[in-house]
Amino acid sequence: MKKRLDITLIKKMFLLSLWTVPVVSQADDIVVADGMWKITYMESEKAFRINVLNEGGAARKCVVNHSVSVARYDNAEGVAREVTTASFADVARAEEAVDNEFGAGKCYTFTFSRPDNGDEVAMKQRFYIYPGLDYMLTDLSVEGHAAIRSNYLAPVSVDANYTLYMSDDGNRMLKVPFDNDGFGRYGKYKMSGEVISYEVSALYEGKSREGLVLGSVDHNLWKSAVSANLSNNGSVNELRVYSGVSTSETRDAIPHGKVKGPVVTSARMFVGYFDDWRVGMETFADANNLVAPRTETWTYGTPFGWQSWGVLESKNSYATDVEISDYYHDVLTPAGFCNSQGNIIFSLDAGDGMSNVEHLNFINQCKKKNQMVGCYSTPFSMWSGENPNWDDVLGTASDGTKWTRWDVVLKANGKPIWYDGAYCMDPTHPYTKSAMANFIRTQYSYGFKYIKMDFVNCGIIQADSYYNPEVTTAVAAYSEGMDYIRRQMDKYGMFAAFSIAPLFPYQYANSRRIACDTWGSIEQTEFSMNAISGGWWTDRLFQYNDPDHLVLVGNKDQLNNTIGENRARYTNGAVTGMMLVADNFSLNDRSGQGWAERSREVAQIVMLNKDINEMADMGRSFRPVYGYKEYNGNADGAENFFMFDNDKYLYVAVFNYQKNELSGNIPLDLLDISSDAFSEVRELWTNELIKVDGNLPYSVPEKDVRVYRFKKTGGSGVKDMENEAMVRTKVVPLGGKRLMVYSGKDMNRIEVYDMQGRLNGTRDLSGRTQMELDLPHFNGMALVRIHYADGTKEVCKTLVY
């Protein structure tokens, strides 16, 4: 028996040697060069360096330098430890093929063993590289006894200064807020000082647009972050990409929950370097969709309609809503305020003032007018006041167990968690789930098609423990609860509209508000456009981005919003993705809220602009043109200039948030369009034709907006594209909504259109001859247009499935 065991052991050692390169106490670096990436483990410094390579294999840029990966854990005896790559005596590299949601590629694993603290643990860092992708992934794990626990793993942890970019005041680091509560803002900080961004960030040169994008693609367990200490507007002193963040901005009062061993692994982290950081952010969103596809269950078109909270708030009533519904049906919708399917949504918020019978009557009346009705819920909030009787019974299990408030509430440091005026409920608790299941079933039976879900971030605050004993982190608890709720809604095809909510996980909602509590003044428009300035790319995570209720004429100081402010707020909705206006249009309402006569007057001027409504019907968010020109010079200020490109038009929206005229010129090369690519430029609010010669001239009055539409030559593009001969390029469907494009000559750009000529995706190639495309949002026949380096182009038709 012993002889047979020895032979088996020898075979295992031989097979391992084929894949593993051991390094023990020596000064040789371990180098991985694969595609556009070069990863070097510098043995003498016990640290990683990551370089981006040019097509020929020469180093283009060092994007991460001197990264000493960090793991914090409790060992088998419960002693808190911290180890880095420098803590281990041995390191070995292994290589294996992988084939997962990102496609076929290679995984390079660095295993660190024999830590100086004497624990029987190993640390493993994996790098995943896929041909044709402009990014790689990396994660970090700590492995040992089943009793180990970890709540902090940093696959990237730079602790020494290096220059990422030449010093320039246009260089920026993007801050992404964890949620949309507390009037938090996106930020584009100059590269000097400390910044923390949640789940993703970009460090980029504003003027060249080159940028490094870092972030997490797994959102079922961890809260992750990117933090940096920067200097000289281009240098990195510290840079950490890690799982296990807990701050006041994540709404946590206690540390991140600890994940159980014997193997604890961070989220996979996206590392990508792009010629245009905006493309990088969009690519990051698409990468997330490969892991967890977004919810795309809504088939009734871009949401246009009315929202009850914005002006009426809690002084709503059945009679008022019926009158407003009639006004939409009789006046606004026939004149063009609706989506391209002719649909309208009436979203009834908290305090709608209706009984169940009135709800049924209202829904039935709306159905006759081709209007759908939405309702309101707060799935994880316990509205009990601050001093409830914790022994109150909320529900009873099938076995007779009674669930009290104390059983259901989340606790931190033994005390119930109070947030945003309510106590937070455990998303894993059977009562929380059953209450929402009953609510959804009942609302659907009434005829509601749309549910606004508010304060859902109450379910993602770290607690001491959860009803489900296997759950130890806030994100895992939230994911369990939201997955259950989403499955209930999918039974009935209902729209989930998240209001106050975290950005990640995203896959449970059809829409999410980009910024909350936004009314109608120019200051409110600027606040909302700040979220588009830094977060436009989130429309790839949600079927629609929501600009919040669009108020034209509101209450108090909002009664006197100027017509320019009205245009700006309305356009804010159109360049975001949804159009739920919230004015009080009822002439017979006696609540004292709003000014119905003025609202109807403004509606005729603003809400019936056919061209703006056609633009809004796309349901897409516009990109910032610059990315570093904040309107007021502050890091959290909105930008003025935004753009969106499809095959028929290029739209450029210019917002003026200030009390004086805004005028100037935008070079066409910044808009990615040449002078011979369009036949006219029209401003959509004044209907003025604009003369363009190398630059787009703009002039925007105080507190107003202008939208410039370039009409591209070639009409919609579909006919022209189908007539172009595809003779050099081969496009192969790979399944999984992926295409491989092979070419006999250098390609500069690939564009993918649907059969109606709508642009669905682009990829800049910089002279490559092959590229794999991921199209997570596309299904069906596609037209693929290839732009070659020599200026020619051609198209082929293919199936995406």
Located regions from the model:
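C-terminal outer-membrane/trafficking sorting elements
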Residues: K2, K12, K719-Y801
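Acidic-aromatic substrate-binding/catalytic surfaces of carbohydrate-active enzymes
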Residues: D29-P115
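Beta-strand-rich recognition/accessory modules
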Residues: V31-A33, E194-Y300, V700
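Acidic, contiguous internal or C-terminal segments within carbohydrate-active enzymes
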Residues: Y108-M166
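Substrate-binding cleft of carbohydrate-active enzyme catalytic domains
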Residues: G301-A463, A477, Y484-D490, A496
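Glycan-recognition surfaces
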Residues: W390-A422, D426-P430, S434, E480-S591
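Carbohydrate-binding surface patches
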Residues: G573-T576, V581, Y628-I673, Y753-M755, ...
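C-terminal beta-strand-rich structural cap/linker in extracellular carbohydrate-active enzymes
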Residues: V692-G715
